[in-house]
């Protein structure tokens, strides 16, 4: 398995993953042929996946210390993203993973029991070795989400545009009360598709209104989800 990351790579993750102009979502199956740097996109441990069969395990409780605020939202072209110079923390596998950024996909990239959701958020964390842990949270269409309402009062319309929130928002308020999760080993879902990522998919489904979902979809102008990838013998724990 390709263990990808140096800390320098992670610190520049927001641009390394989303700003390259030589890939898009029209033919994601060809990503591995576009650039030698993207060869991992044809790997055996790729994300996203369909979580269908799982193995029961005594997974450790997720311990978040998100004591940071959301100040700026940036349009990256392929997503909308919030970066953190000094993020909160996730304790996992006896290590500390620092929150670097979160971004959105619509529709969802990962499926749960074959079901797609209209919105998925990825919280990207890194440890001191530059290894990544991504916490994913799904949104179903339903009632208006108060946190998204405060964040999306004015979304950045153009690629590269940043919007500064008039009132910074606490990122910990985005987390659900129930932190039960699925776990598997995977990759980045965009080029360079680097593997060795610890994926944690929260089971509790959040809600967002049809208008909130539509606002993000219209902003992107296209679906920004990679198709599900083969498990290739990987096990999903819960």
Regions found by a protein language model. Give the residues of each.
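Alpha-carbonic anhydrase
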Residues: 18-238
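N-terminal signal peptide c-region/cleavage motif recognized by signal peptidases
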Residues: 14-16
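Sec-dependent signal peptide recognition
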Residues: 2-10
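Generic cytosolic/nucleocytoplasmic N-terminal low-complexity/intrinsically disordered segments
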Residues: 1-2, 225
């Amino acid at each position: 398995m390709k263990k990808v990351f140096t800390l320098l790579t992670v610190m520049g993750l927001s641009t390394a993953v989303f700003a390259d102009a030589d890939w898009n979502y029209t033919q994601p199956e060809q990503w591995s042929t576009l650039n030698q740097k993207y060869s991992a996109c044809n790997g055996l441990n790729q994300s996203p996946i369909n979580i269908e069969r799982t193995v029961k395990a005594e997974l450790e409780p997720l311990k978040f210390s998100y004591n940071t605020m959301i100040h700026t939202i940036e349009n990256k072209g392929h997503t909308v993203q919030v970066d953190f110079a000094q993020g909160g923390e996730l304790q996992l596998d006896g290590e500390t993973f620092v929150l670097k950024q979160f971004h959105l996909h619509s529709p969802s990239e990962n499926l749960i029991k074959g079901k797609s959701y209209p919105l998925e958020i990825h919280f990207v964390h890194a440890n001191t070795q530059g290894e990544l842990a991504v916490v994913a949270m799904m949104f179903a269409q339903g009632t208006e989400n108060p946190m998204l309402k405060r964040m999306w009062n004015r979304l950045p319309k153009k690629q590269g545009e940043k919007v500064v929130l008039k009132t910074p928002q606490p990122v910990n308020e985005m987390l659900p009360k129930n932190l039960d999760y699925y776990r598997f080993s995977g990759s980045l879902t965009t080029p360079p598709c680097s593997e060795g990522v610890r994926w944690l998919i929260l089971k509790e489904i959040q809600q967002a209104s049809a208008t909130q979902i539509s606002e993000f979809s219209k902003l992107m102008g296209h679906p920004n989800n990679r198709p599900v990838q083969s498990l290739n013998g990987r096990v999903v724990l819960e």
